[in-house]
């Protein structure tokens, strides 16, 4: 009888996990369009925190690596004072939405294209 009760309890505990798994959030940023969708997530929708956090981490990583690789030949230059991350990412989302041709660019290439246009080095 104990093994049957244990099996039943285990099954009951697994049901909420199975139900939760059906609502998995897709966090892919292969294209600039996908990245803009993550960065522009509606904060009131389910999963928005995960999407926005992914966007912030991904874009920070891209900026750090690309600036480190560039050495003295920077692909873009922050103005002084630099814009906030939220302002920059909001402008990136708008840029992709206004110019749909950019949606198909790779996520890294699209972000760097935007930053180079928006913050050119003088």
Model regions and ranges:
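Short N-proximal segments of mature Sec-exported proteins
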Residues: 27-91
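Bacterial N-terminal signal peptides that target proteins for export
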Residues: 1-8
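Surface-exposed, polar helix/loop patches in the mature regions of secreted/periplasmic/lumenal proteins
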Residues: 82-122
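N-terminal signal peptide c-region/cleavage motif recognized by signal peptidases
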Residues: 14-19
């Amino acid at each position: 009888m104990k093994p049957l009760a244990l099996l039943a309890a285990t099954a009951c505990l697994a049901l909420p996990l199975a139900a939760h798994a059906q609502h998995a959030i897709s966090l892919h940023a292969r294209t600039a369009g996908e990245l803009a969708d993550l960065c522009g997530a509606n904060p009131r929708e389910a999963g928005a925190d995960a999407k926005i956090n992914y966007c912030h981490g991904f874009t920070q990583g891209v900026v750090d690596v690309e600036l480190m690789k560039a050495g003295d030949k920077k692909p873009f230059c922050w103005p002084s004072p630099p814009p906030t991350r939220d302002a920059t990412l909001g402008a990136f989302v708008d840029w992709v939405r206004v110019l749909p041709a950019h949606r198909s660019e790779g996520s890294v290439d699209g972000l760097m294209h935007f930053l180079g246009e928006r913050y050119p080095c003088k």
